[in-house]
Amino acid sequence: MLILTRKAGESLHLGDDIRITVLGIQGKQVKIGIEVPGDMVVYREEVYRRVIEENRMALDISNADLLAATKIWHGRTK
């Protein structure tokens, strides 16, 4: 992990397309601005982790669920 020190109003760049600016500091809270290309998605860490977990749960399909869906699809439910 690269660790940098920035003051309010100072920025850093990630590649050519991403700019992160420290907008202000109040106590233990830092307000940052992030400039990214319009096609790039930016998530807060807690939101990103929730999205990943929900996607993982959506992919967890049991064999019984697949068998039931197959029977329904083919019209052979009992």
Curated annotation (Swiss-Prot):
Localisation: Cytoplasm
Gene Ontology process terms (BP): bacterial-type flagellum organization; mRNA catabolic process; negative regulation of translational initiation; regulation of bacterial-type flagellum assembly; regulation of carbohydrate metabolic process
Matches recorded under Gene3D superfamilies: Translational regulator CsrA
Quaternary context: Homodimer; the beta-strands of each monomer intercalate to form a hydrophobic core, while the alpha-helices form wings that extend away from the core.
Keyword RNA-binding found: yes
Species this chain originates from: Nitratidesulfovibrio vulgaris (strain ATCC 29579 / DSM 644 / CCUG 34227 / NCIMB 8303 / VKM B-1760 / Hildenborough)
MF terms in GO: mRNA 5'-UTR binding
Pfam families, sorted: CsrA
Domain of life: Bacteria
Name used for this protein in its record: Translational regulator CsrA
KW Cell wall biogenesis/degradation (keyword) present: no
Disulphide linkage map: none
InterPro entries attached to this UniProt entry: CsrA, CsrA_sf
Main subcellular localisation: cytoplasm
Keywords: Bacterial flagellum biogenesis, Cytoplasm, Repressor, RNA-binding, Translation regulation
Family as reported in the entry's similarity comment: Belongs to the CsrA/RsmA family.
GO cellular component: cytosol
